[in-house]
Amino acid sequence: MITPDGQRTMRTHLGAAMTLSPDEVTPADFAGAKHAHIEGYLLFNPALADKVASTARAAGCTISLELSSFEVVNVARDWILAQLQLGVDIVFANEDEARALFQKDAAYDAYARQLAGYGGIACVKIGKDGAWVARGAEFHRIAPVKVARLTDTTGAGDAWAGGFLYGHLRGLSLAASGALGSALGAECVQHLGPAIPDHQWPRLRALATALT
């Protein structure tokens, strides 16, 4: 449901995703992979999420985790904190998800620093106000990209994470990876639905090249 201000409300139905069994996840699924991204809604099936995380680690993959929704965090908070202790290389959260995880109100940069305290990269997205990215003592405020018209925020967080991962896995700095994430998120919200139109990708790829 999209309101005139471009904001969306979703009631999630996971469908066939909830029928997947941990036994269906095998080392062969990660052959040749160097990174595994775990999307938060998988955490409604904790046994499957455990198998994905453990198998990815055994295959030598780095791991990123997208918290996806404060509702996900409310259900899977213990699992998330346990995985952070084990070691998650990159965590993506927005302000509501970080608040639910740490169960306190704090400044957005404080959430990023606390997440980074687990040893990985923390990306705390704050919508139209940009994001904070932290790793150890390294800390960056990622500026938002202005948009001509806000149409639909569905998928913006995923686009941001996708841009960041694309940059990071190709060796870009944290700041440059965050800038690419911000650009993809900004492009996403200007279109109805979560997909960025094909004709926009040459410009976005050129931006990624320019950031290297």
Language-model segments: residues:
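Short beta-strands and strand-loop turn motifs
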Residues: 11-12, 33-41, 61-68, 92-95
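Residues at alpha-helix caps and immediate loop-helix transition turns in enzyme cores, especially N-
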Residues: 48-49, 76-77, 200
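Conserved phosphate/ATP/ADP-binding segment of small-molecule kinases
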Residues: 53-62, 68-141
